[in-house]
Amino acid sequence: YGYHRGLHSFPTRRSSDLFLDMDFHVLKAIPENLDVLEFESKVLADRGLIPQIPPRYRSTYFSHTFGGGYTAGYYSYIWAEVLDSDAYQAFVETGDIFNKEVAVKFRKEVLARAGQDEAMKLYVNFRGKEPGIDALLKNRGLN
């Protein structure tokens, strides 16, 4: 259970983390007198997130993003879920989630060509369209 406990609130928690990440990183300079918890509360309130579902990581120990490697990129987790959900939908649309033709097309157009062209172009070659949030919302039961 550990990691997945409370999964029902996971999208909200992940959203709050990415908003905090982005809002901290767009500051031109961090004021010396910045009250970190007040800043955090304002960021979340401005996005309509309620205090009853706190961020997964509080700003005072959010080393995952501030420790290097994720600089203003925590949103990539949600983007990966968008791509995953939309690609999975290609299989669902055939009526067979193990559809060999779709799997081969994904391998040929995305995996085998990784790094050879822009990622979005490769994805569109596979899917025939850019990914949207509809499949993600459907997977989460929010459609």
Describe each model-derived feature in a short phrase.
Residues 1-4, 8-15:
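Short, small-residue-biased leader/transition segments that mark boundaries at the very start
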Residues 20, 27, 32, 36-42, ...:
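Non-catalytic terminal accessory segments
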Residues 96-143:
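C-terminal amphipathic alpha-helical interaction region
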Residues 27-29, 85, 118, 132-133:
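Flexible loop/turn segments at secondary-structure boundaries
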Residues 31-45, 58-64, 106-113:
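Amphipathic alpha-helical substructures
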